[in-house]
């Protein structure tokens, strides 16, 4: 009886967390400033640990099957699907978690990459003027998968997003990114029906926390798209703000005041990519969305930025006794990803999804190409809605438990785990480009399945080894023994 009560309470917490604890960090590098000439779209998916359970799945193509309807897991949102929908690889949340599917990151057979969302913040005036449509609207819980199934270009993603929001409304303040061979788009959704999109420059980079970033916005520019009421709605309601150039300032119109929670991440990303233009940090200083980096940006740098806890600075929580500091490398990461778009490849091979499960500080980024036909069963296993439970056979839970143990003591436990996965990623970064050049979907699938199985086996083994290391070295606090000895050496897998 008590066990059931505890489980019910935990599930209730999980349900609340699924609704309100989503808070991510986004990143971007244009093809002219990335190390390998690809477009890079990155994002951490940050939520409560109880909901840190995602899958890797391959959704099949459906050919000439009219009459199908896309249904949200979260609310009453419905959308009629075209007769043919595209195959795509994605990282959805387990159905048992509740709160919607949240495909999170998708790459499809048409060479389109989609990530969503980074949660933004909308001010009270905007929310009152155009409330979010939570009962039947679309949002991060449904839109990424719908777009991946229906869209053959990034521009089609923006257009369909606009049509869906106009007809159904949106559930919350969110930021999306879409990319293809020719262009990439950054989209901010401010209210139930108002949104703006800007074409992302090929020669710049970006990093931002949970805040809207678009300042001066010209609706007539060929590099922008927006909802019909983006400017007229706030103008009529009396809260439109214009900049010195006479154009709408979307941040000042739709967003509340800046906070350290989000703005420090934005500044730290700028300092990482372009230290000479980052300037000194100030809570109330808006940062530029796009800027020229001081160097070429690659996968490794994005991976490590997603892991950072501001080591070596006065804001590192562990070094400075500041447990409340919001780092980019938070323990609440459910999954993280970097999507790459290689314009030189045929469309079905063009996009690769590099993803990790659990807190990426102590797990591994693995590449999955859009052309693969399967993921290992442990990565693709779902749970029935409303029946969320711990099951270490599910890959995300195996990785999450390892990360949870490693982060209890980053000096003695975590460093060795992090170094192990770092070496594994180096192997993938060296091997994968050559494999991709074969343009062989069967070989890519075989390689991916083998890599997934090896990573999972190692995660389970390292967890067992680390648990024994902790036990053998008497590092479990509060055991009553009074032992104070330090281990002879940090844990090494």
Listing of model-derived features with the role each one plays in the protein:
Residues 317-441:
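Substrate-recognition/cap regions that form aromatic- and gly/pro-loop-enriched pockets
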Residues 266-322, 326-331, 416-418, 424-435:
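Accessory, solvent-exposed terminal regions and/or long lumenal/extracellular loops of proteins
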Residues 416-493:
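Histidine-centered catalytic/metal-binding microenvironments
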Residues 16-23:
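Sec/Tat signal peptide C-region and signal peptidase I cleavage site
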Residues 144-150:
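Short, well-ordered beta-strand elements within core beta-sheets of diverse protein domains
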Residues 156-166, 302-306:
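Short, well-structured alpha-helical segments that form the helix of a local strand-helix-strand
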Residues 1-9:
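Bacterial N-terminal signal peptides that target proteins for export
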Residues 24-140, 160-289:
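A contiguous strand-loop segment
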